[in-house]
Regions:
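Interfacial loop-to-transmembrane-helix boundary motif in multi-pass membrane proteins
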Residues: 39-40, 87-100, 121-124, 133-166
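N-terminal hydrophobic segments of proteins, predominantly signal-anchor/transmembrane helices
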Residues: 31-33, 37-57, 63-124
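Long extracytoplasmic/lumenal interhelical loops at the membrane interface
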Residues: 287-351, 367-379
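A conserved mid-to-late transmembrane alpha helix and its immediate loop/hinge
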Residues: 197-199, 234-238, 242-243, 326, ...
Length: 510
């Protein structure tokens, strides 16, 4: 069946290009034969370079290449014991709840039971990729490895986008699903690469940007990764010529600019909510009308997005319980749901929307826990903050776009990072210091045969609590007896107990 949209997409039909088959075979072989921690990187490569029109139909079930590779990755991780020791929590429950609501509600509301198989496939795309990240990214060291590998994979894509901008032709159109000739709006080429829309392409790379900026405090190598990653993301955003990725970049910039207010983030959030509440009663059309005023590159559809939010509020009773089959009657052009929060509600009811919000809130809670306990302005502190900035950027993007195709992957990758940090926060809250018992949190250290690794004993001597201060306000020194005289060594700059660099599976000095 052919479905016409912004680009020609093929569903329920096997559509394979020889190069697409080759890419899938290489990705699956790499997933099976290389270290398991690299599995999500190969999924990222498929998402960036292969359109979702490349798919196989097996016994009536649709398998885009990314979905097939995700199943292979899940099997590889499960067989290798990658999920051993994984502690699931609130974020994991909410992500699963959101997927389950859509699997149940769409077939029931539409009256088409056969759609349950389609929704199960979508659930594999979302939950599968989410669990691949949760099984492989278990600490900050894994997160850093992922960000480095993501840059290696994503950087060559800038060449494809620049060629498309220079020629007006998309070289990835040979795979199908994306047009050969680049769309033009207001006289500007809107490059899209392998993605279904230029907006989605820009948002995908903007979502990766915080992971690269988060490396800034790691010396020369970290600054190089941050600089090159920023250039990659900005080049793609420039080629897309869309307001949404530009606005998302502005929000991320504001988020990182607020890093120096990290100790007062709760006050910042409360102030923002109070300001929005006041503006909602002062403004004639409600605070969400502000989105209609945004037009960064010309030809923006901000007013459509305002009307969509307004209509969703006015029709709340229609979709709140189990979603709805159509929003076409909400207003002119409102069948196009360019808001992820509303799309979740339309597909899975208000519970699905709350699950999306709730996962964000719990992620911020876990991030805030570690920000209060890690050495301020250190590289680990900044990396944790960067994950928060990434989620904040997604919150802004979701007001103006709804993800589909391979782009949905980037949200579940991002929230999985939040789930990892929240998991370690729960461990440490229950038993301070327990998050640092193994070389990699939740997994046995290599060669340990399942036995938790033990950290080297501290030097003999009594380390005074951080609260005790020497004259003049300097941190207290630890005193060790040696040679009949009291030797003095500086107290480790560790903050509260259990936060001296071993909090997320990192050895001291990493």
């Amino acid at each position: 069946m052919l479905v016409l949209g912004d680009a020609l997409t093929v569903t329920d039909v096997t559509t394979l290009h020889p190069m697409g088959v080759g890419a899938l075979v290489v990705a699956c072989m790499a997933i099976l034969m290389s270290p398991v921690r690299l599995a999500p990187v190969y999924l990222l490569a498929l998402a960036i370079y292969i359109p979702t029109a490349q798919r196989m139909v097996v016994a009536g079930a649709d398998f885009p290449l990314l979905r097939f590779a995700a199943l292979v990755a899940l099997g590889r991780i499960a067989v290798g014991g990658g999920f051993r020791g994984l502690s699931l929590g609130g974020i994991d429950f909410l992500v699963a709840l959101g997927a389950l609501m859509k699997i149940l509600c769409i077939p029931i509301v539409s009256g088409k039971p056969n759609l349950v198989f389609q929704q199960i496939g979508s659930g594999i795309d979302t939950l599968g990729i989410y669990m691949v990240i949760r099984g492989t990214v278990r600490n900050l060291a894994d997160l850093r490895r992922y960000s480095t590998a993501a840059l290696v994979v994503a950087a060559p894509a800038t060449v494809i986008f620049l060629i498309e901008r220079a020629t007006g032709r998309n070289m990835l159109s040979v795979f199908g699903g994306v047009p050969m000739f680049t769309a033009v709006r207001e006289g500007k080429l809107r490059c899209q690469g392998a993605f279904s829309h230029a907006i989605l392409a820009g948002c995908f790379f903007v979502a990766l940007l915080p992971l690269w900026i988060g490396r800034w405090r790691e010396g020369f190598r970290g600054k190089t990764i941050a600089g090159v990653g920023t250039a990659v993301a900005l080049l793609v955003v420039f080629c897309c010529s869309s307001s949404t990725p530009v606005v998302a970049t502005v929000f991320l910039t504001a988020g990182f600019a607020g890093y120096f207010l990290w100790s007062s983030l709760r006050a910042v959030w409360v102030s923002g909510l109070v300001l929005a509440f006041i503006l909602n009663f002062v403004m004639k059309h409600g605070v969400w009308h502000l989105i209609a005023r945004i037009d960064m590159v010309g030809g923006s559809t901000g007013y459509h997005r305002y009307l969509l939010i307004d209509a969703a509020i006015n029709h709340f009773g229609e979709w709140a319980l189990m979603g709805t089959t159509s929003t076409m009657h909400w207003g002119n052009g409102l069948f196009d749901i360019t808001n992820q929060y509303i799309l979740e509600g339309v597909r899975g009811g208000f519970v699905a929307t709350l699950a999306l919000f709730g996962s964000m809130v719990l992620a911020f809670r876990g991030i805030g826990y570690w920000l209060r306990r890690l050495p301020p302005r250190g590289m680990d502190h900044f990396m944790v903050y960067a994950v928060g900035a990434a989620i904040f950027g997604q919150m802004a993007i979701f007001l103006a776009v709804s993800y589909f195709g391979q782009t949905i992957m980037i949200w579940y990758v991002t929230i999985a990072f939040g789930g990892m940090i929240a998991e370690q926060a729960r461990r440490d809250a229950r038993n301070p210091g327990s998050a640092s018992l193994t070389g990699a949190v939740g997994r046995p250290a290599p060669g340990a045969s399942g036995a938790p690794a033990k950290w080297p004993a501290r030097p003999r001597g009594r380390a005074l609590p951080p609260a005790e201060l020497m004259p003049g306000g300097a941190p207290a020194a630890s005193r060790m007896q040696g040679g009949g005289a009291e030797a003095i060594r500086p107290a480790p700059q560790s903050g509260p107990p259990g936060t001296d660099g071993r909090y997320l599976g990192l050895a001291p000095g990493d």
